[in-house]
Amino acid sequence: MAVQAPAERPVDEIPPLKRLLPLGFQHVLAMYAGAVAVPLIVGGAMVGAGRLQQSDIVHLIMADLFVAGIATVIQAVGFWRFGVRLPLMQGVTFAAVGPMITIGLNHGVTTIYGSVIACGLFMMALAPVFGKLIRFFPPLVTGTIILIIGVSLMRVAAGWFGGGTATGVDFGSPAAIGMGFFTLVVIIAIERFAPEGLRRVSILLGLLVGTVVAIPFGMADWSHMGDYDWVGFVTPFQFGMPAFEVSSIIALLIVAIVIMTETTGDIVAVGEIVDEKITPQRLADGLRADGLGTVIGGIFNTFPYTAFAQNVGLVAITGVRTRHVATVAGVILVLLGLLPKMAAVVEGIPLPVLGGAGVALFGMVAASGVRTLSKVAFTNTNILVVAISIGVAMLTEAKLYYTDRTLGDGPVNVSLDLYHQFPDWFQTIFHSGISAGAITAILLNLLLNTRPTDELAGDLAGHDAPRGALPDPLDALRAADPATPPQRLRQLAEDRPELRTIIVTNPATDRETCTWIREQGDEQVAAVCRKWDEVTDGRFSTRGG
C-alpha cells in the first residue's frame, strides 16, 4: 500500500507566475508610498542642513527599495535561522525618523549608518530572548509610542504642505496650500467612492493625481531627469565608512525595541491569517531577519527595516496565503531599486502634493496608535502614562525664536531648542520626540503599573501591567468563542497565560483543561472561579463532571 505524501501547507504553495506577478505588484503598490516617505523625510532634512546634495535623495530612494526587496525575500524565503517564512513585506520604519535626523544634524550622515548597523546587530542578538521581554511592552506602551510617531511626523507633513523651500520665500503660498488640500481631497474621495482594491493604494493614487494636476502650474520639476541612467547600481558606503558614536547608537537601540515589538505583532497577526502556529523559535527567526535587513540597510546607506502592517491587511483581504507572493514582491522591489530614473521621478514630486499625502499617511500612523490604545483600560494611572509620555515627546518641539543684533552687521533671526544647553549625548537621545516619548512610556509603565497582585486584582488596568504578555485580539476572540474546539482552547491555555481567565469561563472548555488551568496557581484565575462558584452555587467548578 502506497504511503500518501503529506499535503503541502498553503503558505508553501507556489502558484503559477501569471497569478503571483499581479499579486506581488499589488503588495508593492500597497507599501510604496510609505516605503519612499522615509528617505524623502530624512534626505530632505540632511539636504536642508547641508549634509547631503539634492541629487543624493535619488540614491536614498533607490537604496531603500533595493534593500526592502532583499529584506522581504529573506523574511519570506528564509535561510538557516533567518526569516519567519510567511507572506510579510519589509519596509523602512517611521519609528527611526526623528532619532536619525537628530543624529545626522549633530554628527553627520555616516554616524546615522553606523548607528543603523549597530541597531541591526542588536536586534539579531536580542531576537532569541525577545519573547520573554515583550511583557514590558503592553498595548499601553506600544500604542502611546505609535501615536507619538504619527504626531511627531506631522511637522514634516506641514513643511511639505506649505511647499517648504530653502529660502522660505514661497512657503505657505495659496497655490501650495491649495495643492496640498487638493491631494488630500483626492485621497478622501478614493476612500469614499473607489472599490476595495483601489482604496488599498489611495495614498499612492493621491500622489499620482496630485502630481499630474500640479504639472500645468509649474510645481513639478524633472529638469534633472537627464542626469540619471535608466539602470544603475546601489553602492555600499556611498557617503563614506560608517561612524559609531555611543549616544547615537543608544538612541537607535531604543528604536530597535520598538521595531521588534511592532514586528512581533505583525508576525502573530499574519500567522493567524495563514493558519500557521508562531512558535518562540519562529518568532526569533523573523526578528533576526529584521535585524539582518537593518544591517544590510546600514551598509547600503538606508535605514532600519520592519514588517509593514498594511500588507498584513492585504493578505487578509486577498485570502492568498502563500509566502511566495511576498517573494515576488521582494524581487520587484529589488528591480525598482536599480532604476535611477524611477527614483528621480519620486524625488521630483511637488512638496505640496507630498504634504497632502503626508497628512493622511502620518495621520494613519497616529490613528494606529489610537487603535492599539483602544485595548487599554483607561484608569487614572494609564491616562497619566499616556499624557506624560506625549507631553515629554512634544517638549522637543519647543523652540525660542528671537532676533539677535550682536551676531553680525544686521539683525539675525535665531532659534534655540529646549535642550540646547545640554551635552551632545543628551540632545542626541532626547531631542527626538519619538525616543524621548518611548523612554518615558516604558519607564512610567514599569513604575506605575508594577504593583502587588492584590492591588492589580481590583484595578481595571491590571491587564496592562508588564507582568503579562502582549495579548492578540484574534486569540482573545477564540478564547471566548464557544465554537472554538476544546483542543484549540487547551493549546491557547498553554501558549497564552494571559487568556486563561477567559478560557476557564468558556462553556466549550473541557473539565480536564479547566482543572489544568486552575492547577497553575494563577490567583486571578482562582478569583474568577470563586466568583462563578458563588453565583452558581458551586456548579461552575463541577460542570462537565
Predicted segments with their positions:
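Hydrophobic transmembrane alpha-helices of multi-pass solute/ion transporters
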Residues: 2-14, 187-189, 203-252, 418-428, ...
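Membrane-embedded alpha-helical modules
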Residues: 103-220, 330, 335-455
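Transmembrane helix-boundary motif of multi-pass solute transporters/channels
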Residues: 23-66, 75, 82-108
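Hydrophobic, membrane-embedded alpha-helices of multi-pass small-molecule transporters
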Residues: 18-35, 172-184, 202, 215-217, ...
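Juxtamembrane interface elements at the cytosolic ends of transmembrane helices
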Residues: 2, 35-39, 43, 183-193, ...
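Short, non-helical or kinked segments that cap or interrupt transmembrane helices
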Residues: 59-60, 81-95, 135-144, 198-204, ...
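Alpha-helical scaffold segments
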Residues: 470-545
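Membrane-embedded helical hairpins/re-entrant loop segments and their flanking transmembrane helices
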Residues: 12, 17, 43-85, 251-323
